[in-house]
A protein has these predicted regions:
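Short catalytic/ligand-binding loop motif for oxyanion handling, primarily in non-cytosolic enzymes
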Residues: 71-75, 118-125, 220-224, 280-284, ...
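C-terminal beta-strand-rich structural cap/linker in extracellular carbohydrate-active enzymes
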Residues: 516-531
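Hydrophobic residues within beta-strands of alpha/beta enzymes
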Residues: 63, 212-214
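Acidic/aromatic-lined carbohydrate-recognition and catalytic surfaces
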Residues: 2-202, 206, 219-280, 407
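Solvent-exposed beta-hairpin/edge-strand motifs
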Residues: 505-513
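Surface-exposed beta-strand/loop patches in extracellular or lumenal glycoproteins
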Residues: 495-506
Length: 531
């Protein structure tokens, strides 16, 4: 593939054949925990290549791969030390090209994580930037003088606890870090920094990548005046004081939108998927996915601790206004797995209902690795924790490491993930009963039904592209229609403990699920054609 240039205004033709991502089902690969090929206890690119057939047979349209770039791993690779290379623990650039080529041969698109908000403190850019105030990279990061009494520039707090400022004696200044001190924030107000990342985009697109997932995309810009954030109005004090502020000035700045437009000109119709973390997600999603900006953004609304019919209906309806195209996920590498959050672990019927709900939503959907197996949240003892947030806030925050335990392939040591004596995170013995090998041997397993549901979505333009219309909703139920060109599908989900009567809807052709005598039992679902 030749060089990709930043020219003209990006096309927003929604019927373009390159808009494969609209209605697609993606699969998040947490690379470090997916498959180890060399016995070092960590997943890698060759391991991923060996399992791509499994993902193709699952039926997904593409994969999103978490960071595999050189990193000191203070935040599991989201602290990047080189944006154009592969960390040796994961392999080489040739290994990555093998992933891309093999995936494409199997009909899978490849999306990779990009972390532009901040770099590693060990990146050469930062090493130079902190060395003095007059070097070529001096203004590539966010630096601020202390107040006259030596105190911090403002009241901003870091996401992982503590203040968002760290002192650098070399410059006699503080630098901003919205996450760890080892993750200094880049100064995206500097167009030279923007230009560098546009070149990074071109580099990966030139290697055949089909799209980018943009980590914390609303953190790219900060308020140049460094104004204090106002206090949040809370009913009780949270464990992490970060949530005690309204995030008005340290993220979600309007200046960010112009950079997104520059990114879109480079990407064209290659997918740009934004992670947006803020209190006004619907408004931000609409801004970030307006014509000429990003293709889609995913909401945290369905990653909430508790979900019911009202939460799902309200989130999908709010995100569906105008021409915006949402992306939905029930799990990812940062939250408690959905089977545990929704008390579905050990309940195959309820897990399958959740899978059915996801594939019926309007938008692009993402399955997190292991979700198709019905995995509950992994158990990681305190002494084995790797996540800096969990270590700092133990025992009140156990989200991330438990979502990242190694993938269970079979009954071999380390559940088939690695031949190492010990994996980088402990395997959860409870996951062995849900391994791929065991489920492949059982007709009608959670995995088998998940494959069927993905295939149903893939074969149905109505489910992938149709409009969304709520018929009935409540904490215990959600019934909606998907409508496209006169075709209507009724999708019904029973979250409660009482049966729901669907007979008045008339259900001539049931596509998936069951409602005996027109009655939907608790923890079950129905997808049916409707006249």
């Amino acid at each position: 593939m030749g060089p990709i240039l930043e020219t003209g205004v990006a096309s927003d033709t929604r019927t373009n054949q390159d808009s494969w991502w609209r209605g697609a089902c993606l699969y998040e690969v947490y690379l470090r925990s997916f498959q180890d090929s060399d016995g070092d206890g960590e997943g890698d690119l060759k391991g991923l290549v060996s399992r791509l057939v499994y993902l193709a047979q699952l039926g997904v349209d593409g994969i999103w791969i978490t960071p595999f770039f050189p990193s000191p791993m203070f935040d599991s690779g989201y602290d990047v030390a080189d944006y154009r290379q592969v960390d040796p623990r994961y392999g080489t650039l040739d290994d990555f090209l093998e992933v891309v080529n093999t995936a494409h041969e199997l009909g899978l698109k490849v999306i990779i994580d990009q972390v532009y908000s901040h770099s590693s403190h060990l990146h050469p850019w930062f090493s130079m930037s902190r060395s003095s105030r007059d070097n070529p990279k001096a203004d590539w990061y966010v630096w601020a003088d202390p107040k006259p009494d030596g105190s911090l520039p403002n009241n901003w707090l870091a996401r992982f606890g503590g203040v968002a400022w760290e002192w650098a004696a070399e410059r006699r200044q503080y630098y901003l870090h919205n996450f760890l001190a080892e993750q200094p924030d880049l100064n995206m107000h500097n167009t030279k920094v923007q230009d560098e990342f546009l070149d990074v985009m071109r580099f990966w697109f030139g290697l055949g990548v089909d799209g980018l997932r943009l980590d914390v995309a609303n953190f790219f810009m900060h308020d140049p005046e460094l104004r204090d954030n106002p206090p949040a109005k809370l009913a009780e004090t949270p464990a992490n004081p970060y949530y005690m502020q309204q995030r008005l000035y340290d993220r979600s700045r309007p200046e960010n939108l112009l950079f997104l437009e520059r990114m879109r000109k480079v990407a064209g119709e290659r997918m740009l998927l934004a992670e947006i973390s803020c209190d006004w997600q619907v408004e931000r999603m609409a801004e970030y996915t307006a014509p000429g900006r990003l293709h889609t953004a995913y909401s945290f609304a369905l990653l909430a601790p508790e979900l019911d019919g009202n939460v799902v209906a309200d989130a999908v309806e709010q995100a569906g206004h105008g021409d915006s195209w949402p992306t939905w996920a029930f799990s990812n590498h940062d939250v408690i797995r959905v089977a545990s959050r929704w008390n579905a672990a050990g309940n195959p019927g309820k897990i399958t209902m959740l899978h059915a709900l996801l594939v019926c939503l309007r938008g692009t959907v993402i399955i997190y690795q292991g979700e198709e197996l019905g995995l509950g949240h992994g158990n990681v003892p305190r002494g084995k924790l790797r996540d800096p947030e969990a270590i700092r806030f133990w025992p009140l925050d156990r989200r991330r490491d438990g979502a990242r335990t190694p993938f269970p392939w079979d009954d071999n040591p380390n559940l088939g993930f690695s031949r190492a004596e010990e994996a980088w995170l402990p395997c959860d013995p409870a996951h062995s009963e849900l391994s791929v090998a065991r489920q492949n041997a059982v007709p009608g397993s959670i995995l088998a039904k998940c494959r069927d549901l993905i295939a149903l979505r893939k074969a149905s333009p109505v489910l992938r592209l149709g409009e969304f219309e709520v018929v009935d909703q409540g904490r215990d139920r959600l019934i909606f229609r998907r409508i496209l060109e006169g075709k209507r599908l009724l999708c019904a989900f029973n979250f409660g403990g009482q049966a729901i009567n669907l007979s008045r809807h008339g259900l001539p052709t049931v596509l998936s699920g069951e409602a005996r005598g027109g009655v939907l039992s608790p923890g079950s679902y129905l997808i049916a054609e409707e006249y």
